[in-house]
Amino acid sequence: MAKLLSCVLGPRLYKIYRERDSERAPASVPETPTAVTAPHSSSWDTYYQPRALEKHADSILALASVFWSISYYSSPFAFFYLYRKGYLSLSKVVPFSHYAGTLLLLLAGVACLRGIGRWTNPQYRQFITILEATHRNQSSENKRQLANYNFDFRSWPVDFHWEEPSSRKESRGGPSRRGVALLRPEPLHRGTADTLLNRVKKLPCQITSYLVAHTLGRRMLYPGSVYLLQKALMPVLLQGQARLVEECNGRRAKLLACDGNEIDTMFVDRRGTAQPQGQKLVICCEGNAGFYEVGCISTPLEAGYSVLGWNHPGFAGSTGVPFPQNEANAMDVVVQFAIHRLGFQPQDIIIYAWSIGGFTATWAAMSYPDVSAVILDASFDDLVPLALKVMPDSWRGLVTRTVRQHLNLNNAEQLCRYLGPVLLIRRTKDEIITTTVPEDIMSNRGNDLLLKLLQHRYPRVMAEEGLQVVRQWLEASSQLEEASIYSRWEVEEDWCLSVLRSYQAEHGPDFPWSVGEDMSADGRRQLALFLARKHLHNFEATHCTPLPAQNFQMPWHL
């Protein structure tokens, strides 16, 4: 009876992975209640085959879930319509509640029938036995056997806790349950006395900004968190997970962040290969509709690196909602997991981000300054210009206030706090992070990210002459035109390197540098072009084109 109840309340099972011979438990290991035997690919098909009763019951419950999601998103309009028609009176609401209660009882009955279907299936019974054994005893053997299954991630046991590193428990300066530290925007009206009257005047605007950010704004910024989109992508995500586990020997893990969100991660270890880059770990930060199952993780994988992918809060197996604070909390526990559980030193970690993932990547670089390098692909400097691009001009004040208070993705500000090597990849046909049209390459916000970084690190070089010549170089529409500008100013790379190395040897590596202070205008132009070319590479593609492995290069450093 207990097993039947477990089948009724248990998670949905999607797939049974093929188990490699090298990973199977030795035959001499005795079978115990906490060490059950996982299925081999020779005995069962790798796709879980539900019985007819479970299959049809699952379809009914999935359909009900979709209808509930549609009702949730359309509830404001439905409420307004029912109110106008007078259907919200007590005489109408009471019968409706009876109908709703009857429907819930029917769905509960369907769930029980699904449980009976699972109970009659030996595949599911063996899975639920392994799952229960792992929750009782998280031994390495139980975890290894549980990893052979792909199921609803909410039931996966937590593998790593944000407080697990001993240094976190002893230090008061680490993150609290309120979250890690973020750079906060300055007040919009500096110098104004923050009296009670001013607070009352601002209250309607603050409430409006909050409602916009938590309804339309967050879903526009992170469409991957919308349940209906995830439901449509589920088959693709399952295929991507199967590829990572079966072909790349990936290991899935659940991390608990300081805000209570559970973060879904996938680790592919290449340290045992002959490739030297396998000793380096690339932590991948996906875009606003990207998942590690099908996202930018494929680029460093193809290049031979060890890779750690993770999903934003609210994406696929990760819980929560993707606001900046939650994003930073998630990135923090991912980096801690890489250092304290996977055993990588910060000097062996590379942060790689695509598009909106640049926020968490730059936060990690700012918060963990010893990481080896940062690579930002198709990213931007600040969210406000891109948000203003897609909203009516009359909403400018509301949009700016909402972004600054609730959705402040200040990539450039965070990146300038990092002292290590940086590479920016600009897509020359990008249709997402341009503020006008894709053909207008100067409206690509990657340009502004580069300029802000160089102006912070080399303010004397990026004075008037240097800034002007870098803008000309950024405006070049082809590699031939870029080379023409570079050769026009007769950039001597050996001279530039010697100047920079001499300055570093004398003054140290900390930015900003005053190099170029006593230099001629032509010298500053040469240095500015040299530095721009070293920090930014062009990729002739649109925003969502996968980056080829040959374009995944380590950033330049002295």
Curated annotation (Swiss-Prot):
Keywords: Hydrolase, Lipid metabolism, Membrane, Transmembrane, Transmembrane helix. It is found in: Membrane. One of its GO terms (molecular function) is monoacylglycerol lipase activity. The keyword Transmembrane applies. GO terms for biological process: monoacylglycerol catabolic process; phosphatidylserine catabolic process. Its EC number is 3.1.-.-, 3.1.1.23. InterPro entries: AB_hydrolase_1, AB_hydrolase_fold, ABHD16_N. The chain crosses the membrane at residues 60-80, 93-113. Residues 114-558 are cytoplasmic. Pfam families: ABHD16_N (PF22990), Abhydrolase_1 (PF00561). It is a multi-pass membrane protein. It catalyses: 1-heptadecanoyl-2-(5Z,8Z,11Z,14Z-eicosatetraenoyl)-sn-glycero-3-phosphoserine + H2O = 1-heptadecanoyl-sn-glycero-3-phosphoserine + (5Z,8Z,11Z,14Z)-eicosatetraenoate + H(+); 1-hexadecanoyl-2-(9Z-octadecenoyl)-sn-glycero-3-phospho-L-serine + H2O = 1-hexadecanoyl-sn-glycero-3-phospho-L-serine + (9Z)-octadecenoate + H(+); 1-octadecanoyl-2-(9Z,12Z-octadecadienoyl)-sn-glycero-3-phosphoserine + H2O = 1-octadecanoyl-sn-glycero-3-phosphoserine + (9Z,12Z)-octadecadienoate + H(+); 1-heptadecanoyl-2-(5Z,8Z,11Z,14Z-eicosatetraenoyl)-sn-glycero-3-phosphocholine + H2O = 1-heptadecanoyl-sn-glycero-3-phosphocholine + (5Z,8Z,11Z,14Z)-eicosatetraenoate + H(+). PANTHER family: ALPHA/BETA HYDROLASE DOMAIN-CONTAINING PROTEIN, PHOSPHATIDYLSERINE LIPASE ABHD16A. Belongs to the AB hydrolase superfamily. ABHD16 family. This is Phosphatidylserine lipase ABHD16A. It comes from Macaca fascicularis (Crab-eating macaque). The gene is ABHD16A.
